[in-house]
Amino acid sequence: MKYYKFGETNIEIGSKYLDLYLEENNYEEDQNILINKLKENGFLLIKGLHDKQEISSIRKKIISILTKDDIFDSGKNEITGNLKEGIIKTSTVRGNEKIKIPELDILYSRNKFTSFFENLLGGEIISPEFKWLRTVGKGSSSKTHCDSVYMGRGTKKMLTCWTPIGDVSPQMGGLAICLNSHKKNEILKTYAKSDVDIDLIEGHFTDNPLEMVDKFGCKWATTHFKAGDVLIFSIFLMHASLTNTTNSLRISCDTRYQRKDDKRDNRWFGECPLMHYRFHDDNNIKEKLVDSRLRWGI
């Protein structure tokens, strides 16, 4: 039996809780088929939308920039990004704050990539200038949440695109999605309608990922992601990341896309976006998760 760590819980692959399988699609497939799959499943795993060598080059550059922090084992391959023994890198690096590399902007502006999203969304697209570039070290993970609570003031058709910067195994903290969670009305009418800057909730839905299976019947699924892959999903789809149990730094980048003529969440657009003006203010007291769940009645 094989187990992966999910938060503080070890979950058996192939159990009722977690599958090591996500349906794969090619970017050249019929767009109508992909659109219908996205609507039905809430996600698309697209193989080879980015150039593998370009992704590898970006990973090398990010690791090179972070080398000055003296966190890497210099004896390892430069693309591996192995952390020194005893160092736990748990911080999230924001692309707009610490690492600014033009290669990321070039990556996401390539015609192959933008054309795919324009076909998927049925019109000219726009993306927030802000990019969520993340480095995830040993012991780190993200909790169960959907993106609507963070960026739900604009169109409800906004899509998240998660790009692994390099190969990402489940052991490295790959993303896991909660199948069919975007169809759960009890969540859509309560938690998913929340706004972290208005309601000052904690952001995530549960501390226990197994609850999504036991209470809501939504199984988790992940896979071995390869450089060049992208995982596209609805802002209402519950997701999380497995815990990185390796010494390799997981690097990924989140970007968001919507039709240019759709309503925007202005917290995330412009050269100096407002972002989370209350949620990240330590002077504001957030509602405890247990109290939020009681208020929602779920």
Language-model features, listed with the residues they occupy:
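Non-heme Fe(II)/2-oxoglutarate
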Residues: 1-24, 72-74, 187-193, 227-232, ...
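Non-heme Fe(II)-dependent double-stranded beta-helix
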Residues: 2-41, 47-144, 150-151, 280
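Extracellular structured ligand-interaction cores
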Residues: 43, 156-162, 172, 220-222, ...
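Short, conserved beta-strand element in jelly-roll/cupin
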Residues: 152-170, 224, 232, 256-259
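Active-site region of the double-stranded beta-helix
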Residues: 123-126, 148-153, 165-174, 180-182
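Double-stranded beta-helix
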Residues: 170-237
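Short, charged/polar surface micro-motifs in flexible loops or helix N-caps
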Residues: 123, 136-139, 167-170, 183, ...
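Generic beta-strand structural signal
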Residues: 123-131, 140-142, 157-163, 173, ...
